[in-house]
Structures are given as structure tokens and as C-alpha cells.
């Protein structure tokens, strides 16, 4: 039984398959007891609910928003000029407390802009980040940033690590998350000026920092929080999505190639279906924002009803974890950590002790 908490606001007009697939996903979640605020043009959404034969007993309420942010709209301008757009209205519902979280498969830049404009950032947060929860061999790992900040400074990576550790602990449920920076090797000498500066600071942070990890470690589960800039993170995620799709296709072709393989394929179908489900991006549903004063999830633009339903469940779980309350405290030491690292780097090395061999 779901504990009493404010509904999840769902942007019914965001995504390639809106509003039909979005409404269906919301209905599926509502049928499992999750209260929903469906946001968009009221008349159109009521028609959609009727088309999907959603009964009046379901915990779904329609909240009118008269404008829509298109995929080619400039995010900042859309938030300022289309003040009644469904993304912004979702965030206003979160800010007012009428919604516990929001989900949108719409323009991701507009979702980020709306979060900053409407919710604002916790004290001390330089830039928000987007998290991806990865299906690892051991549980789950989280990767951030996924594209919110492509040109990072050391303080951004430090804060991503601190915020990601909070999310892994409070939402994912990892008691003591291992945190690493994504680099081209595990040695301290690897990486760039950016990663080395952030790593030097994080070695003295109040978390379990394990240094660098490599791309091969993304899905092993050996590291719980993997930190990188938004450009690298986005490329890494898209590469994993593409690889999973190609590997799945290879397996299907191989199992269909001969009669013996076909029999083997039938015998292994359950295992393959389990693997496919584990790697299916729709199972994750959406990518949470961290570093704003509220819970927001960005779903893939091509999300179907399955993805939206899962995003709603995950948004609900994140809201119940109250992780946002801890973010300001987590990032508070970030400036001091960087200053301390810079001070240590500037110190001259200790003088070499004389030995009998020097004589």
C-alpha cells in the first residue's frame, strides 16, 4: 500500500507519442494506486481519458495547461514566453506542494530550464545535474552528469559527486556508496586537468571516494556513483544504449540461424527475455534531476506507456526518500575542498633528509 503523499504531476504533452502514450502510462500507474495530476489542455486530456476508458474511480486529476513546449523551442525563451506551458505548470505544482514530483518526456532543455526558473537551486549548488541509473551486474550504478553541464569546472564535478552520493544513499538505498570519476585509466596521473583537480578535492571529502574508474566499469556495479561532465556522460549513455540494441539483435539472428540454434533459443527464451528486460531503457523510465528544490524526472522523447509508468513509480520513490533536503548540506564543503586541494598542491615538497651516502 502506497503511503499518503502528494500526487505525481505528469506532463501529458511531452514526447513523440503524446498525449496518448503518456495518458496510458499515467492510467497504468493510477491503477496500481499512485495518484496522478495529468497536466495539459483539459478538454483534450479528458477526451484521451475517455478514449482509454479510464474509470472515474482512478486517482487521476486533470490540471489545465494551455500551452506546449515544442522540441525545437528554445528552452529559456519557452519558459519565459509560454508561461502556461505544461512543463512549467508541472513544476509550479511541485513548488506549491500540490505535487510531490513531476515527469516529462518533453524538451529536456526546457525541463531543466523550468526546474531552475520555478524551483530554484538549493543554497550552494552551482549547477544542477541529470542522473542516469544504470543496470549493473551488481545492483545499479548511477552516472552523472548526462548533459546538463557539458563544459564543467572542477567545482561542478565535486558537487556532482556529493549530490550523487546523496541520491545513491537515500533513493537507491546503498548504505555507503563508492564514488569515482570517469577517466582514461585508474592511475592518479591519468585524466585531464579537470578530473585531476576534482579528484584531489574529493580525496578529502566526507564520502567514500575510490579514485578513477574506466568506461569498462560502468556496468559492473563495482562503483555506485560515476561522475563525469555532461558531454562525456551523454555519449557514454547513448553508446551503451546502442550496444545493448546491437547485441540483442546479434543474439536473435544467431539463435534463428539453424534448427539446433532455434531449439536452443526456445529453451533459453526466459533467460534472454530477462536480460532484455534488464537492459531495456524503458524499465528505468526517466532520469532524475539533482541540484534543484524539488523532484523532476526527464523521460526519453520516444517514451511509451511502459516507460512513463516506470518513470512515475521512480519519481514517487525519489519524492518519498526526501533526498532534496540533504543536498544543500552535502555541497556545503565543496569550495573548501577545492581550496584545500589547491593549497596542498602549492606547498613545496619536504626537504630531502641527508644520509650517510651524501657525504
UniProtKB/Swiss-Prot annotation:
It comes from the Bacteria. Keywords: Cytoplasm, Lipid biosynthesis, Lipid metabolism, Phospholipid biosynthesis, Phospholipid metabolism, Transferase. It catalyses: a fatty acyl-[ACP] + phosphate = an acyl phosphate + holo-[ACP]. GO terms for molecular function: phosphate:acyl-[acyl carrier protein] acyltransferase activity. Disulfide bonds: none annotated. Its main location: cytoplasm. Its EC number is 2.3.1.274. Pfam families: FA_synthesis. Signal peptide: none annotated. Belongs to the PlsX family. Homodimer. Probably interacts with PlsY. This is Phosphate acyltransferase. It comes from Anaeromyxobacter sp. (strain Fw109-5). The gene is plsX.
Amino acid at each position: 500500500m502506497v503511503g499518503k503523499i502528494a500526487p505525481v504531476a505528469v506532463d501529458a504533452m511531452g514526447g513523440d507519442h503524446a498525449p496518448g502514450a503518456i495518458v496510458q502510462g499515467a492510467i497504468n500507474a493510477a491503477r496500481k494506486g499512485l495518484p496522478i495530476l495529468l497536466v495539459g489542455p483539459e478538454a483534450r486530456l479528458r477526451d484521451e481519458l475517455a478514449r482509454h476508458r479510464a474509470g472515474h474511480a482512478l486517482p487521476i486529476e486533470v490540471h489545465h495547461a494551455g500551452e506546449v513546449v515544442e522540441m525545437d523551442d528554445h528552452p529559456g525563451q519557452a519558459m519565459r514566453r509560454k508561461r502556461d506551458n505544461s512543463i512549467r505548470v508541472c513544476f509550479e505544482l511541485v513548488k506549491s506542494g500540490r505535487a510531490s514530483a513531476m515527469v516529462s518526456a518533453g524538451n529536456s532543455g526546457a525541463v531543466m530550464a523550468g526546474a531552475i526558473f520555478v524551483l530554484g537551486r538549493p543554497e550552494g549548488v552551482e549547477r544542477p545535474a541529470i542522473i542516469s541509473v544504470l543496470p549493473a551486474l551488481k545492483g545499479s550504478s548511477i552516472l552523472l552528469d548526462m548533459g546538463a553541464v557539458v563544459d564543467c569546472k572542477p567545482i561542478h564535478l565535486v558537487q556532482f559527486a556529493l549530490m550523487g552520493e546523496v541520491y545513491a544513499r537515500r533513493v537507491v538505498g546503498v548504505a555507503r556508496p563508492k564514488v569515482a570519476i570517469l577517466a582514461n585509466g585508474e592511475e592518479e596521473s591519468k585524466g585531464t586537468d579537470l578530473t585531476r583537480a576534482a579528484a584531489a578535492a574529493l580525496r578529502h571529502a566526507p564520502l567514500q571516494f575510490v579514485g578513477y574508474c574506466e568506461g569498462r566499469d560502468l556496468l559492473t556495479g563495482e562503483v555506485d556513483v560515476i561522475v563525469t561532465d555532461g558531454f562525456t556522460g551523454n555519449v557514454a549513455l547513448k553508446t551503451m544504449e546502442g550496444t545493448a540494441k546491437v547485441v540483442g539483435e546479434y543474439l536473435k539472428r544467431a539463435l534463428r540461424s539453424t534448427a539446433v540454434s532455434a531449439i536452443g533459443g526456445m529453451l533459453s527464451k526466459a533467460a534472454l527475455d530477462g536480460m532484455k528486460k534488464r537492459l531495456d531503457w524503458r524499465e528505468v523510465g526517466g532520469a532524475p534531476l539533482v541540484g534543484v528544490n524539488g523532484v523532476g524526472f526527464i523521460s526519453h522523447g520516444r517514451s511509451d506507456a511502459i516507460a512513463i509508468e516506470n518513470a512515475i513509480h521512480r519519481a514517487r520513490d525519489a519524492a518519498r526518500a526526501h533526498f532534496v533536503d540533504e543536498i544543500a548540506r552535502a555541497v556545503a564543503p565543496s569550495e573548501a575542498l577545492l581550496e584545500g586541494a589547491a593549497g596542498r598542491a602549492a606547498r613545496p615538497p619536504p626537504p630531502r633528509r641527508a644520509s650517510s651516502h651524501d657525504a
